[in-house]
Structure formats: structure tokens, C-alpha cells
A protein has these predicted regions:
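Short aromatic-glycine-(Arg/Gly/Cys) micro-motifs in beta-strand/loop hairpins
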Residues: 1-12
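Short low-polarity hydrophobic stretches
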Residues: 4, 26-27, 72, 82
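A short, exposed loop/beta-hairpin motif centered on an aromatic-Gly-Thr core
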Residues: 11-21
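A short, charged, amphipathic alpha-helix used as a generic interaction element across diverse proteins
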Residues: 21-39
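Short, mixed-charge low-complexity intrinsically disordered segments
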Residues: 36-85
Length: 85
């Protein structure tokens, strides 16, 4: 899996992730592998190969780091998913 990170401060970054089954796993992996710290916000475009349909799949995940807590955020939801160690 690949993740393209669009940070709120304007920086962009590409990282390779181990396979993640949920948005929560993506958020945690991006925060750990993408070197995000307290106060960072980002939109993450996750790309993976779908072998059954022989095409790439994309999904967007919004991540915010509050202190050392990782949150999935949207216009209506702010969900705690883990902590940065």
C-alpha cells in the first residue's frame, strides 16, 4: 500500500505502508511512519492494488494529532483511534 500525505502546513509526502484493513490502522500507520506530531493535521490518499478486480483502489482518510492522540476526523465526527508512542 502507498499513502500520499497532504499536510495542513502545505508539505506533501509519499510513504509505503504495510497492508491496513481499516481507516484506524491507516491513521495509526501514517502517524508513526509519516513522522507526525502534536497539532499536525493531514489528508491521506491511500492506494492499494485490488487483485480480484485487477485495478487500483483509492480512499481518503483525514487524520489529526492532538497531543499524542491520533484522531480520524470529518465534518461531523472526531474519533480517537490510538496514541503515538
Amino acid at each position: 500500500m502507498f499513502a500520499h500525505i497532504y499536510r495542513a502546513d502545505g508539505r506533501e509526502e509519499n510513504i509505503e505502508l504495510d497492508y491496513c484493513y481499516s481507516d484506524e490502522e491507516v491513521a495509526t500507520a501514517v502517524c508513526e511512519d509519516g513522522d507526525m506530531g502534536g497539532g499536525d493535521r493531514a489528508i491521506v490518499c491511500v492506494t492499494r492494488w485490488d487483485g480480484t478486480q485487477q485495478r487500483f483502489r483509492h480512499r481518503m482518510v483525514r487524520v489529526a494529532v492532538k497531543g499524542n492522540e491520533i484522531h480520524l476526523v470529518s465534518n461531523t465526527v472526531d474519533r480517537f483511534v490510538g496514541t503515538i508512542e
